[in-house]
């Protein structure tokens, strides 16, 4: 049975490993560590005593922004991202958050998950994300009313 708990200081090496595997242009370890604190709701997904995913979300008043969500590739496509996202949304709602924002690469297959969970496309940021080959890719800005 998967567990969802708050991220702790000792989790960062594993989070960084997942980040490197799961994203086209991953965050650095420093960026992961810098996105922590009282304005954040950061969760880890544990299965069989191992962290297999995480979400990093910043809250400001009644809005939140999901900065990063990642599931280890071996566990993708099994509903784990949906489970983590649903728990995050539930905890945000309990804290009085009304709107959850995110941006996602146009090519990211997770877009279907966000749409299925109630997110709507709000805007396109042209040439926002870098690609490994030196090019750029659009970001899709999405919002969900909790």
Language model: regions and residue ranges:
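Acyl-donor (CoA/ACP) binding surface of acyl/acetyltransferases
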Residues: 78, 82, 126-128, 138-139, ...
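Short glycine/proline-centered loop/turn elements that form peptide/ligand docking sites
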Residues: 81, 85, 107-110, 127-133
């Amino acid at each position: 049975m998967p567990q969802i708990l708050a991220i702790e200081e000792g989790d960062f090496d594993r989070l960084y490993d997942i980040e490197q595997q799961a994203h086209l242009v991953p965050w650095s370890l420093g960026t992961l560590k810098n996105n922590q604190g009282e304005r954040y709701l950061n969760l880890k997904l544990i299965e069989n005593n191992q962290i297999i995913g995480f979400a990093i979300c910043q809250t400001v008043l009644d809005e939140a922004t999901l900065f990063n969500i990642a599931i280890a590739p071996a566990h993708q496509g099994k509903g784990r991202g949906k489970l983590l996202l649903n728990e995050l949304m539930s905890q945000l709602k309990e804290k009085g958050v009304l709107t959850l924002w995110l941006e996602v690469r146009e090519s990211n297959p997770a877009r279907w998950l966000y749409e299925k969970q109630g997110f709507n496309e709000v805007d396109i940021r042209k040439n926002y994300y870098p690609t490994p080959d030196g090019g750029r890719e659009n970001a899709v800005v999405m919002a969900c009313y909790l």
